[in-house]
């Protein structure tokens, strides 16, 4: 697994991480199976795990899994997501409880009350509970506001959507991140599963075999990771074997411009 520097955070993270939206929002008997996904990811070299209080039980389930399989091997990225000051305090207190008193990467989710939440996260950083601060948004309509935050100098990295069917961030967000030295975490690199469900025929992957591509999901991940401005891509999965497969996409070699365009054409079919 290749490791990449996450912008000004000073941290190195695995090129492929693990997202937890929907897949770790479980209770009771389903929790053990999801713990195994986290264990498989760690075993495969994945170090970055992304969550949010917006994701239901995901933070708690992830925290329990990391306690079982190796919190010290993980870089936890979670978020604060509320316009209410008291709720923001509660969210951060809960997250610190879930993750053994420290959060490596703390993000303002979807820029909600961004300036006030940055104040809170900066205080936690001063207290030694947070290592690095970022901001996220999923919508192209919010990219101008996100870029204002990037220019403000208060974040070390951003999390934005990037996949073979959605390259909007390449127009302005990625160039600005590169200029400012900010890290980039790519959300929905598989299009929230939509692109994987539209997999091309195996014969169409033959031109990509020399890059270690075994599956369409790996081709999609290598498309994102072949952009050197991306620090980490965070696909989500509920299956240990898929976590292992996804992790292998984080190994060089990565695509050149010809292969990237080929994957884009396949994704548009």
For every predicted segment, state its role:
Residues 96-116:
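Active-site groove signature of glycoside hydrolases
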